[in-house]
Amino acid sequence: QNTILRFQTSTINIHKYVIICNKEHEFIVQEQIHSLQLTHEFQIICEPIGRDSAPAVCVASLVDSENTVSLIVPCDHIFDDAKLCSLIEKSSHHCENSVITFGIQPSYPETGYGYIQTNDKNETLGFKEKPDKETAETYMEQGSYLWNAGLFMFQNKTMIQCFEQYAPSILKTCKETLAKSADSNNVIALNKELFETCDAISIDYAIMEPLTTQNNNIKCYTFKYDGKWSDIGSFKTLHDECEQNEDNNTLKGSIITENCENCYIESECAIVATLGVKDLIIVNHRDALLIAHKDQCQDIKKLIAKIPEENEDLKIVHAKAYRPWGWYINVEGNDHSGFKVKRIGVYPGKRLSLQSHNRRSEHWVIVKGKARVQLDDQFIDMSPNEHVYIPVKALHRMENIGTEMVEFVETQIGDYLGEDDIVRYEDDFGRV
């Protein structure tokens, strides 16, 4: 949302926002976009599996007019919005037959970022991998190197030409994927079978490095951004950007500390009490608890990758699941516990599918908003503190007929309570 709002208040002529995300995040992104009440067009491209930035940029270049100017912006960076937008506008006249990049003036010899070498004519001389400490210090001394911010600007036809020249297999696969992908309601769901065959490679390696080292007719320019910037790529950098108390602790939620220093502690579901610790990341959510040293939080991916190896019963299942009509939170119970309790929210004007279940009954208690429940051939308007019982195999549907969220508590009872025990008869989102 902050990334979109950055450009909403600028004078840049925005034609459309294109958001590329994983399929799991589709409904979160939709909810966040709709809550902004945008007047601009938007499109969501859902990847079934991550393939790094090159395929994502390739797909984005193919879905709009070849003469459209595209600006690629990471959503986890912090900028001085006014300075960034001013720089983008000033540099946009270089887009003809060129790829524009933006670099950050280094403030110290960082080894965790890539670097871009440039000259006083803003010509890009090369992209450099994440250096060791000695090399990073040399870059600082030379003064012609900038941190790679991951921002790119180009006409779509120029980027497609780059893929034709340097990564033709990616271009071919992305074209085939788009031809076989579902496209409805501003959402493109990329074909999994085809997209997973695409090479997993960054735009830097696939396109930018050969573009700046081989002779060709496409120019590359780099413009220096010298305002506030941070790449929120870890809990450590998130902590650096958040408000801190006198002990350099960031505390979010119900937190009690004593003699603790330099910690990021967040809890959404329970009191967290810490005593005599420092330099820790503690994140307590409904579905998982993370405790990590700040110096090792870059390795969280390694920890996640070990979960199936350590215990096949450990599954990454989010306690809060998003749907096109709203969300639900699993409060208690599982598929085989005999009962399951959920808290469910429905957006204004939205409704669940007309459905039935073969192996469970349900009890709904309204706790917020104005709801209309269909139960077989009955339609019942309901308010907070009212209850309805839904027998096994009964047709039922929940609809929000008000202007605020409807929230209700659902108690399921049966011998099997999996999400696949559902028969849909009508659905506003094409899931029948």
Please state what every model-predicted region is:
Residues 38-43, 123, 216-218:
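A short helix-to-beta-strand connector/capping loop
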Residues 408:
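Noncatalytic nucleic-acid binding interfaces
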Residues 73, 366, 411:
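Catalytic metal- and UDP-sugar-binding loop of GT-A-like glycosyltransferases, i.e.
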Residues 81-194:
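Conserved core of the sugar-phosphate nucleotidyltransferase
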Residues 1-72, 78-80:
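Conserved N-terminal catalytic core of the sugar/cofactor nucleotidyltransferase
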